[in-house]
Amino acid sequence: MNSIRSRFTARLLTASTLLGCLLSATRADSQRWKPDIPRTWDDAALADWATPVAGLNVRPTHISATEYYSLPTENLRTYPVYFPGREPNGYWDMLQHVGPKPLIEPDTLTTETDWIQAGRRVFDEADDLHLRTFDPTFISAARNREALEQTLARPLPDGTVFGARWVPTTSGVALSFSNCSFCHVQYLPDGSRIAGAPFKTTAPRPPNRFPAMPLISQVQTSKRVVTGATPFFMGSEPVGMWLYRAYGVPWRPDDVHERLKTFTQDEYDELDTASRSSGGIARWNGSLYYPAKVPDLIGIKDRKYIDHTATHLHRSIGDLMRYAALVSFADTADFGAHHMLSTDTRRVQARLPDEALYALALYIYSLQPPPNPNPVDATAEAGATIFRREGCARCHTPPLYTSNKLTLAKGFDPPSDVPAMLDILRISVGTDPGLALMTRKGTGYYKVPSLKGVWYRGHYLHDGAVASLEEMFDPNRLADTHVPGGWRPLRSQTHAIGGHEFGLHLDAAERQQLIAFLRTL
């Protein structure tokens, strides 16, 4: 009898334990943060997402959801490249043996904070899939001190080479380069960083940012890739035709990009270097002649449109995921009847999983500006009065310091069937219309930018021609003899920066007061 009672008690305890574990797991699962992850590529969401292209009044053609989701997913961790002599002991050996590891593991993420931290990893580690290379020549160059020093490259304070990444795969260790963080991190003189802020090219920056570009350029050429996160491997045509297919605007009879067809590699490199003085990169469908500075991602959650020319709506987190996918591996070159690619051009055959893009977007939404060192003193208070008096708030409306509306590019007459989604101020501030009218990213509009964070952003106006607030409010910038602090056309020492003349009539004292106020935002 005692034996039967003991067995019964043991079974009862086992059942109780199992029930307790089940209840505990159920409770933990009920407390788990379960995000509602939208589909990145959704045909219904894509239908009215883009703004029609100026001069054609048609939206760019996007690949279908079926084609997008047929791309294989890529979910690999990457590791920093250390400057020779700064690599930790055993690091290279570790890379040879660690094997491929997942960039994001959704099943391990139980809180919103976990997802945001996973998004930071995507932001920092996700690489440009089209630039990943196993070529031993490039891998050796990335580990060769003399080769790096010939490019004037220097390590960051932690000993790493900015933007370069190692990728352990099933085929060995590849060299690649950062995707998001290459452009959307600003380094301060002390080596600290502002995630989400655009890099500067006229202020202190990682000494190895652009001097190290020769290695990236060599990889791009070897893989038949145009700069600016191109989602394609170009065909067998000469480099000039690659450029035309990346940037040409055939529906414009005065298309400046026609001249690219005969460019040599050296001519391309010269023009590309000049365009980078804007604080930006000529993205696919953008322009080497009408550059766009890298935008600030801090505060993007409150922005209604994406890109300087409002190429796409920002209606929800799904749109930010969609845009990240678009510019990384899903862009096209089809505009109505105009199909820009050659028959032997190949799309990058990879994409990030939806979970990675969702985590990335969450992280970007979470970004905060650094502590503002500028005091709200009497000078700044006087500047706030001037800001209100001059009517600046009509466009740069507090608290976001943007109305989230669009202004007309100089000379643009909107069509009669403007989509209802566009909130347009029927005014033009007179800035250079090239990006908005002469490129495939041209919509005819410029969005009103937020003034929040102008103290750290640097490079003003959409083309980054203005390098400081002092230059922005200097009446002399309107003169042909002006020497821009930022972008200027190739081989031009002087260049007038027209448009947005608000505040130029103020006297010197009032200008300084207004600038002091703007720096507190």
Regions found by a protein language model. Give the residues of each.
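Bacterial N-terminal signal peptides that target proteins for export
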Residues: 2-13
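Bacterial N-terminal signal peptides
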Residues: 14-21
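Periplasmic c-type cytochrome electron-transfer domains
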Residues: 28-521
